[in-house]
Amino acid sequence: MNRLNIAVSCLATALLFGCEALHPPAPGDNPDYAPTYPVTPDPKELRKVSGAIYSSETALPLFETPRARHPGDILTVYLIEKTDAQKNATTTQRKNDTTKITNKLFLGRPISLGSGYSMDFDLDNQRQFNGEGRSIQNNKLAGSISVTVAKVLANGNMVVQGEKWVRINQGNEFVRLSGIVRPQDIKADNTITSDRIANARISYGGTGQINNTNAQGWLSRILWGPLFPT
């Protein structure tokens, strides 16, 4: 009975590892990429009469470019990510040991084990190991995404974040981005390239049937899980 319980427990654990799947991402499920909206002024504050015509809450800039600078402002990011990585490794180890003993003498006299026997022997040991590895990886991501300013730091830099979802046929494609932007790097048309964003976090993926075809099945996940280490 104990063996049966152990077998059932092991099978249940294996099924859990095999059936384990990450919840597919969905729009708005991650607050790190949620949009930030401008702060709406209190109507009571707007109704206060100070005697001046100018009001900072309703002011519109007339002589400055429409660049993002306040929380809730929109900034367009052009994605120009490209990485090329290549690594080669070659290892060779070789060792040869040879030992030969002849003319055995003890106290100046030859040693004999009798007729038909000899104490002469040769020992030859050879070991060799050859290893070679090569890895090549190329990645490229191009496109654009509009994000919002989430926070303005003390030095004037801005934390931006956002996501874009596009439904194509039976699946969804998404791009998520967050990072820190310098106001000086924003162009006059309120755009910036992704290579100018510090601490950038860029994610591209998809959901749906087409994306699921690239994932392993439950049996493959069991065989490649921690219960069957390679």
UniProtKB/Swiss-Prot annotation:
Keywords: Bacterial flagellum, Cell outer membrane, Lipoprotein, Membrane, Palmitate, Signal. One of its GO terms (biological process) is bacterial-type flagellum-dependent cell motility. One of its GO terms (cellular component) is cell outer membrane. A lipid is attached at C19 (S-diacylglycerol cysteine). One of its GO terms (molecular function) is cytoskeletal motor activity. It comes from Legionella pneumophila subsp. pneumophila (strain Philadelphia 1 / ATCC 33152 / DSM 7513). The basal body constitutes a major portion of the flagellar organelle and consists of four rings (L,P,S, and M) mounted on a central rod. The keyword Glycosyltransferase does not apply. It holds the Pfam family FlgH. The lineage of its organism: Bacteria, Pseudomonadati, Pseudomonadota, Gammaproteobacteria, Legionellales. Belongs to the FlgH family. A lipid is attached at C19 (N-palmitoyl cysteine). Residues 1-18 form the signal peptide. Assembles around the rod to form the L-ring and probably protects the motor/basal body from shearing forces during rotation. This is Flagellar L-ring protein.
